[in-house]
Amino acid sequence: MKEYEIVCTYLNGCAGAAHPIRTFEEAELSSPDDYIREKHSADFSRFTKEIQSDGKIVYTFSETVTYIYEFTEI
């Protein structure tokens, strides 16, 4: 298991929200995939996954609402 800092950004296009909502947490995970699958089981297959050059893992779901999860190993 690895420890991650997780930043979740939520944008609601329908409600006309002008500002994103961000949450921060630290968690010990066996896999960031499992974390996303647990939170969004119905939509997991529609998330895109990107591994950035600095090792950060970013999952994005963008439809009426947008979720962006950033996992940084600590």
Language model: regions and residue ranges:
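Short, solvent-exposed coil/turn segments at beta-strand boundaries
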Residues: 1, 26-30, 52-54, 73-74
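Short aromatic-glycine-(Arg/Gly/Cys) micro-motifs in beta-strand/loop hairpins
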Residues: 1-19
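N-terminal targeting/docking segments
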Residues: 6-9, 22, 49, 66
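A short, exposed loop/beta-hairpin motif centered on an aromatic-Gly-Thr core
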Residues: 15-29
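Short, non-transmembrane alpha-helical segments in secretory-pathway proteins
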Residues: 31-36
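Short, mixed-charge low-complexity intrinsically disordered segments
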Residues: 38-74
